[in-house]
Amino acid sequence: MGMTIAEKMLAAHSGHDTVVPGQLIECATDWVLCHEITTPAALRMLEERGMDRVFDPQKIVAVPDHSVPAMNIKAAKMYQKLKSWVQEKGIEHFYDVGRGGIAHVVLENTGLMKPGQTLVSGDSHTCNAGALGAFATGVGSTDLAGAIYAGKVWFKVPETMLIRVTGKTNPGVTPKDIVLEVIKQIGADGANYMVMEWVGDYIDQLDMEGRFTLTNMAIEAGGKTGIVAVDDTTRAYMQQRGVSPEQYTEYQSDPDAKYKVVVEIDAAQVEPTVAYPHIPSNGRVAGSDRIRVTHAYVGSCTNGRITDLRDVARILKGRKVAQDVQMIVVPATQAIWKQAAQEGLLEIFVDAGASVSYPSCGACLGMHSGVLGPDDICISSSNRNFVGRMGDPSAQIYLASPATVAASAVEGFIADPRRYDAEGNDLNAAD
């Protein structure tokens, strides 16, 4: 029987010729990604057991991103713990405040993580890196401790869901809308402990930024990870980061690979989608209800990339954020922040009345720099809209594409971005 991409990677990293879903394996990890929130707990476990070592300091990437710059003393102590450990263990791949940004987006841009490799991190959106044709997944602090100490993790080989997206999207429809549509169709647990493998001619023509958005949200359907097979787009992306095809292994699913579920999506039928509170699967067409918003947030590891910021600038240029809306734009990394500045995007945001913040996860999980208060209503380009996710439990979070967030910020209500053409012109201006 043939194997899927994920099964081939797990077999190669566990010393097996083949693996099957449900099989328990001990899997070698090529990389361990650490941030300041979950890593200290893992380090305490190791210290308490006299196992305070690192399996390979060259295979650990550390990026403080959730609570930085520190907003209180507790956050400062977590940051200090991570940084002192990095210095003590000689971990070179450390992207400090002012040099990094959101860990998942930092990692995807470094060229360190390569196709065919494995990655674990104490963060559920580690699946982001699956767009590189890699196996990347989040783990708890106990497994994170094991990975730091031994470079290995126990896995149950997951089943795979094949998601075939064909055709072309209509103007105003983005990869975020595609993934929200998929989650709407299969449910928030529809891919529970499965690999979500993305294929189809829509995927073939999609840039890497869009692919990262798709794999990033695998966990929002319960997925173990998301994966896109390596192709010319992947190879070009790696080449731009100084990595040649000789430096990594490509895996493709066999023609007779077995899939648990096959989902078919016609891209032309997908509309701008908004996930209503309080679950990402609660998708509806953008603008179908007149819902006032008090906050608009663009950022996160899902949609804080330069292409996302360009979509936002296209709509905000020459316009103002509605008077009663607080809009925050967070470039995902320092490099993206700098590029956005060079392209004049930040000036557009500021002129429109948006606040441009430093790269961090702060607002996304209600930790700092954009926490929602009682009864606030936020439209967000992030990945989760659970009760209390971004602040007060009474606040409501609507998930959408950056373009939909921008259109909604301007109009003060959840809006359909299709009323703005490719140049940002309002097609309904004459109404």
From Swiss-Prot:
Pathway: Amino-acid biosynthesis; L-leucine biosynthesis; L-leucine from 3-methyl-2-oxobutanoate: step 2/4
Catalyses which reaction(s): (2R,3S)-3-isopropylmalate = (2S)-2-isopropylmalate
Gene3D superfamilies: Aconitase, domain 3
Biological process annotations from GO: L-leucine biosynthetic process
CDD domains tied to this protein: IPMI (cd01583)
Domain of life: Bacteria
UniProt record similarity statement: Belongs to the aconitase/IPM isomerase family. LeuC type 2 subfamily.
Biological role: Catalyzes the isomerization between 2-isopropylmalate and 3-isopropylmalate, via the formation of 2-isopropylmaleate.
Name of the protein in its database record: 3-isopropylmalate dehydratase large subunit 2
Native source organism of the sequence: Deinococcus radiodurans (strain ATCC 13939 / DSM 20539 / JCM 16871 / CCUG 27074 / LMG 4051 / NBRC 15346 / NCIMB 9279 / VKM B-1422 / R1)
Organism lineage: Bacteria, Thermotogati, Deinococcota, Deinococci, Deinococcales
